[in-house]
Curated annotation (Swiss-Prot):
Protein source organism: Haloquadratum walsbyi (strain DSM 16790 / HBSQ001)
Reaction(s) catalysed (UniProt annotation): L-seryl-[protein] + ATP = O-phospho-L-seryl-[protein] + ADP + H(+); L-threonyl-[protein] + ATP = O-phospho-L-threonyl-[protein] + ADP + H(+); L-threonylcarbamoyladenylate + adenosine(37) in tRNA = N(6)-L-threonylcarbamoyladenosine(37) in tRNA + AMP + H(+)
Record's cofactor remark: Binds 1 Fe(2+) ion per subunit.
Domain Protein kinase: start-end pairs: 339-533
Subunit structure and binding partners: Component of the KEOPS complex that consists of Kae1, Bud32, Cgi121 and Pcc1; the whole complex dimerizes.
Name of the protein in its database record: Probable bifunctional tRNA threonylcarbamoyladenosine biosynthesis protein
Length: 533
């Protein structure tokens, strides 16, 4: 079978021919290069209109020359349906519809972000991976569950590549900015910048503002580039590890154009090696936007019968990956976590190694060799202090938490009471989720947040539901911060539960009984602000 793929979501006009028989993938691309500054949507669309017919023509000629007859011999057309820039997508959609009618072959509408994931799955052979997509307009973590790729975590403002480009435009550098930052960082020293992780979600806007201010205040550009790269990529690596810990997966796939950065791949590889996980990053031609990944996913969708009619083939600039029904992997195992049983054997979480000693638990935040040493020391100490203080503060409010016996921020070590029999994930019931909502409402009314209230960070037994691991928590009266706590919990339930809807309803009901009235309306705002809602 031979599939023609067409890509053109933003800057890359690309066509590809994928032969499933011998796994050959021929790609022809013509990227848009602005004369100055960043990517201009109108100019990108004009480039797409000119370049896309040319790359398609080249691939069609290749299809004829590589076939056994003079016929083109293409079985289906797959195209990027979204997400992306509307004007560019419309050019792609028109080209795909024209070809499918001219050749009388089926049409397949592909989600661009799932294609970034699936090319890595296809080439690695992984069975239940978490995928980190790091591209220009996007950054998110995906895992297959309940016939969808669930979003386990994502940027709450801008994509990682776009964030870096905003900084480089401030310097007067033209698009793309990522390779220029990578080159400059080789000569710089680490400069401290804000580090914003909330559960498995993250934010780049504050980092960009701080980086611009640093340059304006005459901090050497190379130092700011080093700090920017170390901070952003450490955040992405941390949330990837958190996703592995939450789901229990031991496989990580990297996708997206930012994945071409050597330092990001080094960090992810180091993290996976440390926790005994496998890591796969496709070669560069499959990381940047390309039609090869569209053709490969298109072939899988075609074999599963997931084609569309021309009348139903409208492009979607806001096409989220979790809106796609994944029929081509319908019989596969979900990315779901085996709940931890904390006995005397050490248990490794995302941040720490935890060991039970009789009725005590010793938790040590381990050094993360992927992070810059200065950043690592800062985070380990800050989070150990926060966990000790906020765990005790929550307990004083009547929220079930373990007693803290000792805390050493310098070594990142805590000693606390052993509580619960297993994680909430092992007994994820309506009543327990209702109780978690009540607990979060109480701490929010007291002026602080948990920071990472996933099903991994609630311990349960027959009598209680204990909140643990307040390391990402902090004091705040901002409704946005409180709503993010709710968002993190709901996201963890959605990504792992077999029937999340009644659990989420119970959780929100519990919060309404004890929490702040404006928080749930802000939660709806946050959900609508996620990338491409």
């Amino acid at each position: 079978m031979r599939i023609l793929g067409i890509e053109g979501t933003a800057w890359a006009a690309s066509a590809a021919l994928y032969n499933t028989h011998d796994e050959t993938i021929v790609i022809e691309s013509d990227p848009y290069q602005p004369d100055s500054g960043g990517l201009h949507p109108r100019e990108a669309a004009e480039h797409m209109s000119t370049a896309l017919p040319e790359v398609i023509s080249t691939i069609l000629e290749r299809a004829v020359s590589s076939g056994n007859t003079d016929a083109i011999g293409i079985d289906a057309i797959a195209f990027s349906r979204g997400p992306g820039l509307g004007p560019c997508l419309r050019v792609v959609g028109t080209a795909a519809r024209t070809l499918t009618q001219a050749l009388s072959v089926p049409l397949i509408g592909v989600n661009h972000m799932i294609a970034h994931l699936e090319i890595g799955r296809h080439q690695s052979g992984f069975t239940t991976p978490v995928c980190l997509n790091a591209s220009g307009a996007n950054a998110h973590l995906l895992g297959y569950h309940r016939r969808q790729y669930q979003v386990l975590g994502e940027t709450m403002d801008t994509g990682v590549g776009n964030a870096i480009d905003k900084f480089t435009r401030h310097l007067g550098w033209n698009h793309p900015g990522g390779p220029k930052v990578e080159a400059a960082a080789t000569d710089g020293s680490y400069h401290d910048l804000p580090y914003v992780v909330k559960g498995m979600d993250f934010s780049f806007s504050g980092i960009m503002s701080a980086a611009k201010d640093a340059v304006d205040n005459e901090v050497p550009v190379v130092d700011v580039c080093t700090g920017l790269q170390e901070t952003i990529f450490a955040m992405l690596t941390e949330v990837a590890e958190r996703a592995l810990s939450l789901t229990g997966s031991n496989e990580l796939v990297l996708g997206g154009g930012v994945g071409q950065n050597d330092r990001l791949r080094e960090m992810l590889s180091t993290m996976c090696t440390a926790r005994g996980a496998s890591f796969y990053a496709p070669e560069s031609r499959f990381l940047r936007d390309n039609a090869g990944m569209i053709a490969v996913l298109g072939a899988a969708m075609y074999e599963a019968g997931q084609t569309i009619s021309v009348n139903d083939s409208a492009v979607d600039p806001t096409f989220r990956p979790d809106a796609v029904t994944v029929t081509w992997r319908d019989d596969e195992t979900s990315v779901t976590r085996t709940p931890a049983t904390l006995d005397k054997t050490p248990v490794r979480g995302a941040e720490a190694i935890v060991r039970r000693i009789n009725d005590h638990v010793v938790k040590r935040r381990v050094e993360k060799s992927y992070r810059h040493p200065k950043l690592d020391r800062r985070l380990r100490a800050e989070r150990t202090r926060a966990e000790a203080r906020l765990t005790s503060a929550a307990r004083r409010l009547g929220v079930p938490t373990p007693l803290i016996f000792d805390a050493d921020p310098e070594t990142g070590t805590l000693v606390f009471e052993y509580v619960g029999e297993t994680d909430l994930a092992a007994d994820l019931t309506v009543s327990r989720c209702h109780a978690v909502g009540q607990h979060l409402g109480r701490i929010h009314n007291a002026g602080f947040v948990h920071g990472d209230p996933t099903t991994r960070n609630v311990r349960v037994d027959s009598a209680q539901n204990y909140l643990i691991d307040f390391g990402l928590g902090y004091h705040t009266d901002h409704v946005e911060d409180h709503a993010m706590d709710l968002h993190v919990f709901i996201q963890s339930v959605t990504g792992t539960a077999s029937d999340p809807a009644p659990l989420i309803t119970a959780f929100e009901s519990g919060y309404a009984e004890t929490g702040i009235s404006t928080v749930q309306s802000r939660l709806r705002d946050i959900e609508s602000r996620g990338r491409y809602h």
